[in-house]
């Protein structure tokens, strides 16, 4: 069996981020223990959907994607974001599994009410949201990373199959830094704060 794993990290606030890529590689390596072959690729290296500023890459995308699919011949595809790449996989009739790491629908709502208030940007958000809904609806299965998100998926796509994907974190890959001098008792919080609304909650700590 062959599984194509596609990492969508690398755009927006996660530009040059490798964290999610490492997690997907670990998953792929684990699959090999069960005689499953995998290929891990960066989504933007093979396909860019519309709207985009990279028109040259957009027009050459389908050719690159066709070559990738024809050479690797995947039995299934796992993507970690809801984009045109996933939509193209659905159109080709290949089973698609969508990894969902956050409350996508809340993110869209918050984005339109804060940083994307202009008519043009709101339209772009709407177009991408429409693509995402098609990906969710047409996927073989949605894989939220926790039970809470599974309930959220059921609210938006009640008939779609979903199961919790326990990703886990390998702390051996963390960068070492000098410790902080803390006054005990204290509480530590670790957060991947690359989404604006999530960082807002940290302001609560100023009052604690």
Regions found by a protein language model. Give the residues of each.
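Helix-loop-beta element that forms the nucleotide-linked donor phosphate-binding surface
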Residues: 150-169
